[in-house]
Amino acid sequence: MGGDFAPEAAVKGAVMAVDAIGDECRIVLFGDEDRIRAVLKAENCAADRFDIVHTTEVIEMGDHPAKAFQQKTNSSIVVGFGYLAKGLINGFASAGSTGAMMVGSMQAVKPIEGVIRPTISTVAPTVTGGKVLLLDVGLNVDCKPEVLAQYGIIGSIYAQAMLGIRNPRVAVLNIGEEETKGNAQSKAAYELMKESEEFN
C-alpha cells in the first residue's frame, strides 16, 4: 500500500467504505499484512471484514514506473493488478505511484480497444451546484491533439453513465476562451473537437 500516509490513510478509507457499503461487496487489501492489521486494530475494526493479501515490496514515488512494475512483482500495485487481470477482483484502486498505475492499466488489464492512452479524472463542484468532470489531471505531461480529443469522448461517456448528465458539454481547458489562444496541442485538439459529432 503506497501513497502519502500509507498504509494508515488507505486502510482508514477502506474501513469507512466497508461501514458504508456493508456486505454488498468484499474489499481486498494488498500490502504489509502486519501493518494493515495494526491499523485495523487501532480503528476497532475486525480484520475478518476484509481479505488481506500480504505483499513485501513498495513501488516508491521516485521509482521509474515501467521498470518498477516489472521488477517489484510483489508490490501491492503489481499484485493487485494481477488479481484484477485474473478476474479475482472487480476493481482496483491505489493511492500509490500514478505512473505504476498507468503501466498496470496498460499491461495487466489492457485498455478498451481503440483507447490511445488512459487518463485520470476528477469531479469538481460548480458554482451553480452542478458537477464538472476534469480529465487529464496528473498523468500525462504532454498529449497529442488526438488523445485530448479522445478524452473528450471518454469524458462525455463517463459523465452520462456515472454522473447522470444527459448531454454533457465538452471543452478544452485553456488559457483563454479565444480560439487563437493556447499552445499548439490545445489549439489542434480544439479544432478536432469542434469538428467531432461524438459529443456536444
Language model features: what each stretch is:
Residues 4-11, 74-87, 91-105, 116-120, ...:
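Short glycine/serine/threonine-rich phosphate/pyrophosphate-binding segments
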Residues 61, 100-104, 110, 129, ...:
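Short, well-ordered, mixed-charge alpha-helical segments that flank or form enzyme active sites
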Residues 8, 21-28, 34-37, 141-200:
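Glycine-rich phosphate/diphosphate-binding loop of Rossmann-like nucleotide-binding domains
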Residues 103-138, 195-200:
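Short, acidic/small-residue loops that bind anionic groups at enzyme active sites
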Residues 4-61:
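N-terminal glycine-rich anion-binding loop in soluble enzyme alpha/beta folds
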Residues 29-31, 53, 94-96, 123-124, ...:
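Short beta-strand segments
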Residues 45-89:
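Phosphate/nucleotide-donor binding subsite
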Residues 1-2, 57-58, 97-99, 177-178:
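Short glycine-rich anion-binding loops that position phosphate/pyrophosphate groups of nucleotides
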